[in-house]
Amino acid sequence: MNLLHLDSSILGDHSASRQLTHEVVQAYQRSHADSQVTYRDLASEALGHFSAASLAAAGTPVEARDASQQQEVDTNEATLQQFLAAEVLVIGAPMYNFTIPSQLKAWFDRIMVAGRTFRYSEAGPEGLCGGKKVIIVSTSGGLHVGQPTGAGHEELLKALFAFIGITDLQFVRAHGLAYGEEPRANAMTAAQQHIESELFAA
């Protein structure tokens, strides 16, 4: 099984989501000894924001592209191919200002490609990436699940993946991390217990 591990937190070694995605991947490897893991750090190796230049590069014939346009096309295609090759994705998705990190959104902008990961028909949009499994490590300083303030975080992630045909999503949550040392420790412990005892249980 090919597993794609994505981190998007800007907090480096201080990141709760990075710690937990690492533990998820370790747990997955223990139960899937033949798994092949590809790691990508979307914060330290950030993709540029999707822009008019991105669209222009894609729409320019190969022979007419300048070096920067070709680099943009190559980066976008490599990102898409990396996603398409993955059967399982483990994604660290902290909440920043009620939504996902902009670095993670830039990644979505590279994989949501008409004709490749979804298509339009007379019946409407159709996702083309069914069969993949996604495990999302969701972290936040407050408690937002089920609240209007959470709509741009987990609900957004569900909508983005559903649009391209992926509905097998599992969440590992560590929320309320800014509420003090004890609530943070309790949230992290609960997430770790979920990873160890439930996430990959037969």
Curated annotation (Swiss-Prot):
Entry GO MF terms: electron transfer activity; FMN binding; oxidoreductase activity, acting on NAD(P)H as acceptor; oxidoreductase activity, acting on NAD(P)H, quinone or similar compound as acceptor
Keywords assigned by UniProt, alphabetized: Flavoprotein, FMN, NAD, Oxidoreductase
Cofactors, names only: FMN
Cofactor note: Binds 1 FMN per subunit.
Reactions that this protein is recorded to catalyse: 2 a quinone + NADH + H(+) = 2 a 1,4-benzosemiquinone + NAD(+); N,N-dimethyl-1,4-phenylenediamine + anthranilate + 2 NAD(+) = 2-(4-dimethylaminophenyl)diazenylbenzoate + 2 NADH + 2 H(+)
Family annotation (SUPFAM superfamilies): Flavoproteins (SSF52218)
Residues that, per the record, bind FMN: S9, S15, A16, S17, M95, Y96, N97, F98, T139, S140, G141, G142
EC number assigned by the record: 1.6.5.-, 1.7.1.17
Superkingdom per UniProt: Bacteria
Transmembrane segments annotated in the record for this chain: none
InterPro entries, per database record: Flavodoxin_fold, Flavoprotein-like_sf, FMN-dep_NADH:Q_OxRdtase_AzoR1, NADH:quinone_OxRdtase_FMN_depd
EC class: oxidoreductase
Stated role: Quinone reductase that provides resistance to thiol-specific stress caused by electrophilic quinones. Also exhibits azoreductase activity. Catalyzes the reductive cleavage of the azo bond in aromatic azo compounds to the corresponding amines.
Subunit and interaction comment: Homodimer.
Family membership noted in the UniProt record: Belongs to the azoreductase type 1 family.
Protein name according to UniProt: FMN-dependent NADH:quinone oxidoreductase
Origin organism lineage: Bacteria, Pseudomonadati, Pseudomonadota, Gammaproteobacteria, Pseudomonadales
Gene name tied to this protein: azoR
